[in-house]
């Protein structure tokens, strides 16, 4: 199985009718969200910026729609590789991403659920629900292989996700997951040590401020790799 997919709309447009591409894109993004896999949407996102300093309104809407569909990342190609305005293209895409993220709602219904939730997903969904109800700005996750962090991300929390891991490869992979900030630590010896270090990292990274409510999810501390604990703390 792959770790994720890239929705390359240019290639899709060659293989399937052009009017089907948007539906294929939405279907693939939803399946990746459901399976907790990374999904990147790419090709011709701001294509007119190869020659022009501003995108068309349709292109801006295309980027925003991919984000609202649930993509983890959007990618430029010719715009930054050979275009006249690479810096402007990256800047405008980042602005569209930031603005759209503000309006994406948490996905706490059953659309992305399996018929029977795994323990990890059930706990992580509960953590997102708790964070929303408490207006917590941050969810801190202990994760070894990244599964717990991706399970939290699956439900589109408003809160940022701080993924604490001892695995540098996991941290690198989580850089592609939407809303996740990975931090590598030397060790996580116990649940109490995770709570203490996680809160310190929240303050050090600037993702949390003194007095903030945070939800902490312990995934890496269970031998089976299953997340089974979510708790509420104050920084």
From Swiss-Prot:
InterPro entries: Pyr_Knase, Pyrv/PenolPyrv_kinase-like_dom, Pyrv_kinase-like_dom_sf, Pyrv_Knase_brl, Pyrv_Knase_C, Pyrv_Knase_C_sf. Pfam families: PK, PK_C. Mg(2+) binds at residue 11. Its EC number is 2.7.1.40. Substrate binds at residues 10-11, 43. Signal peptide: none annotated. It catalyses: pyruvate + ATP = phosphoenolpyruvate + ADP + H(+). Pathway: Carbohydrate degradation; glycolysis; pyruvate from D-glyceraldehyde 3-phosphate: step 5/5. Its cofactor is Mg(2+); K(+). Keywords: ATP-binding, Glycolysis, Kinase, Magnesium, Metal-binding, Nucleotide-binding, Potassium, Pyruvate, Transferase. It is an enzyme of class 2 (transferase). One of its GO terms (molecular function) is magnesium ion binding. Homotetramer. Belongs to the pyruvate kinase family. This is Pyruvate kinase I. It comes from Photobacterium leiognathi. The gene is pki.
């Amino acid at each position: 199985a792959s770790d994720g997919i890239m929705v390359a709309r240019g290639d899709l447009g060659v293989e399937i009718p052009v009017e089907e591409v948007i539906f294929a894109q939405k279907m693939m993004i939803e399946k990746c969200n459901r399976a907790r896999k990374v999904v990147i949407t790419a090709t011709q996102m701001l294509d007119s910026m190869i020659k022009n300093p501003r995108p068309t309104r349709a292109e801006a809407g295309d980027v925003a729609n991919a984000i609202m569909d649930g993509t983890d990342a959007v990618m430029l190609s010719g715009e930054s590789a050979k275009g006249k305005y690479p810096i402007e293209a990256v800047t405008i895409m980042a602005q569209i991403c930031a603005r759209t993220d503000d309006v994406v709602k948490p996905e706490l219904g059953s659309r992305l659920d399996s018929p029977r939730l795994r323990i990890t997903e059930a706990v992580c969904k509960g953590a997102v629900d708790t964070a929303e109800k408490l207006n917590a700005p941050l969810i801190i996750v202990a994760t070894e292989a990244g599964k717990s962090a991706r399970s939290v991300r699956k439900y589109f929390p408003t809160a940022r996700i701080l993924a604490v891991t001892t695995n540098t490869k996991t941290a690198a992979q989580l850089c592609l997951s939407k809303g996740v900030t990975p931090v590598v630590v030397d060790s996580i010896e116990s649940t109490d040590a995770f709570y203490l270090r996680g809160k310190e990292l929240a303050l050090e990274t600037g993702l949390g401020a003194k007095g903030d409510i945070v939800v902490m999810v312990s995934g890496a501390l269970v031998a089976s790799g299953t997340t089974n604990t979510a708790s509420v703390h104050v920084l």
